[in-house]
């Protein structure tokens, strides 16, 4: 059995009863398209097409309950009300199951004018969004791997993520890890990343190095080895 993270491996053993000796962790990797070498002209053209400016807060993934977007929305609302944050929050991802709660929360908090939902973006556009964002916020209650976090690291985008599921092993020390439901902690961490240039620069430089530990060549070699040993 192949698991895409140690967290998934533990779940297969603990929840499904898979024999530990039969479960091998083989990590995924980010598409090289997300590397940090997008040209300024390409990034600027993408921002113009999407009517965005640099420095926005970004969340990537399907809109569904496990992504825990209401917590992010409440933290964002707090920053707008208490700290005067004016940059938009961009939600990039399709509508999943029970997505209505996200839009109900947006309406209840009066955020309709400052939260942008981009339901369909190409990988090339997403790569430019990572390059232009002030930070990626990834507050999921659970991820089996968490490709958006790895993509953002690869692109040199500061990452603030949940400390649940696979995210600690994917993000490592290259991002900030938080309890997923602590609105105060999310507001504080996002404010730090968006306003502390030294912290943001440290995370931008740490991201590609962390992402470099996950390559498709390693994934392919480990998968081939697993098949040969079956």
Enumerate the language-model features and the residues they cover.
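Carbohydrate transferase catalytic cores enriched for Leloir-type hexosyltransferases
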Residues: 1-230
């Amino acid at each position: 059995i192949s698991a895409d993270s140690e967290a998934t491996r533990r779940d297969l053993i603990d929840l499904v009863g898979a024999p530990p000796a039969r479960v091998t962790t083989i990590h995924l990797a980010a598409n090289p398209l997300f590397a940090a070498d997008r040209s300024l002209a390409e990034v600027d053209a993408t921002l113009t097409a999407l009517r965005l400016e640099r420095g926005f807060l970004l969340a990537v993934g399907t809109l569904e309950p496990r992504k825990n977007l209401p917590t992010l929305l409440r933290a964002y609302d707090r920053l707008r009300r208490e700290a005067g944050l004016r940059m938009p929050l961009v939600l990039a991802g399709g509508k999943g199951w029970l997505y209505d709660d996200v839009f109900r929360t947006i309406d209840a908090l009066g955020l309709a004018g400052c939260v942008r939902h981009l339901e369909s973006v190409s990988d090339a556009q997403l790569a430019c969004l990572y390059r232009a964002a002030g930070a990626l916020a990834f507050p999921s209650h659970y991820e089996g791997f968490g490709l958006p976090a790895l993509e953002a690291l690869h692109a040199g985008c500061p990452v603030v993520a949940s400390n649940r599921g696979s995210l600690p092993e994917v993000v490592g020390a290259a991002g900030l890890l938080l309890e997923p439901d602590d609105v105060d902690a999310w507001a504080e961490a996002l404010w730090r990343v968006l306003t502390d240039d030294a912290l943001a620069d440290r995370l931008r430089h740490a991201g590609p190095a962390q992402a470099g530990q996950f390559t498709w060549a390693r994934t392919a070699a480990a998968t081939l080895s697993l098949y040969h040993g079956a």
